[in-house]
């Protein structure tokens, strides 16, 4: 689902071969945004380790792109307890309070429900009013725990329609990523055998799908 958003931006899924885009986005976060995302001050070295492909293998990530640059992201991780998952959002300062978090969380909830998740947990600092307001928008139950707030959002139940929606969205997202134009509709390439465009597309596909990412 290549969804148009504010100022020509769009939300789509990130694939395993695009972890470098996620790393660069996290490194661009200012000090306050980093603290909100990770629950405390973190260094560049911490982010470098956090965004290693091996560390993100179990995550499903959606991104908000503007002119091909990742400006916001939502990360979904299944928990050991059946039916539970956690989500974390990050948005670069200039794009905050612009509806980016809402668009990202909508995609996360669709993916969570289709993975049999019943409860989606979102942890934030007590002073992070913006994320708490976002969670309330999705009817979250908030509980306060020693300086932190946990939002519990009920994920929608999976249906044949929701499964088809995600499959179609993933297909469009992958095609967009292959063409390397994240904020533009996928354009048709020449289909002549051995064309430079086709070889470039095939190489990009191989890079995007380095490991199985179809969870």
Q: Residues of each region from the PLM?
A:
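Terminal substrate-recognition subdomain of acyl/acetyltransferases
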Residues: 1-7, 123-215
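A short beta-loop-alpha structural element at the N-terminal edge
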Residues: 9-24
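Short alpha-helical
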Residues: 17-21, 82, 126-130
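Acetyl-CoA-dependent GNAT
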Residues: 28, 36-84, 92
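A conserved beta-turn-beta hairpin within the catalytic core of GNAT-like acetyltransferases
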Residues: 78-87, 96, 145-147
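A short, internal acetyl-CoA/4′-phosphopantetheine-binding micro-motif in the GNAT/acyltransferase core
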Residues: 88-97, 125
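Conserved acetyl-CoA-binding loop-helix of GNAT-fold acetyltransferases
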Residues: 97-112, 119-121, 133, 137
């Amino acid at each position: 689902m290549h969804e148009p958003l504010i100022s020509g931006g769009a939300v789509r899924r990130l694939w395993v071969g695009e972890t470098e885009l996620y790393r660069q986005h996290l490194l661009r976060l200012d000090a306050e945004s980093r603290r909100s995302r990770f629950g405390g001050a973190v260094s560049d070295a911490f982010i470098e380790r956090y965004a290693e492909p091996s560390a993100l293998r179990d995550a499903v990530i959606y991104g908000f792109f503007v002119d091909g640059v990742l400006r916001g992201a939502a990360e979904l991780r299944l928990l050991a307890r059946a039916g539970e998952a956690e989500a974390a959002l990050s948005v670069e300062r200039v794009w905050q309070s612009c509806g980016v978090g809402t668009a990202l969380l909508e995609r996360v909830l669709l993916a969570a429900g289709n993975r049999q998740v019943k409860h989606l947990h979102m942890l934030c600092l007590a002073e992070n009013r913006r994320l708490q307001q976002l969670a309330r928008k999705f009817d979250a139950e908030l509980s306060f725990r020693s300086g932190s707030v946990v939002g519990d959002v009920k994920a929608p139940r999976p249906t044949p329609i929701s499964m088809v929606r995600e499959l179609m969205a993933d297909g469009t997202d992958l095609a967009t990523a292959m063409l390397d134009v994240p904020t533009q509709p996928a354009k048709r390439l020449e289909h002549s055998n051995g064309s430079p465009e086709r070889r470039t597309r095939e190489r990009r596909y191989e890079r995007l799908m380095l490991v199985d990412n179809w969870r």
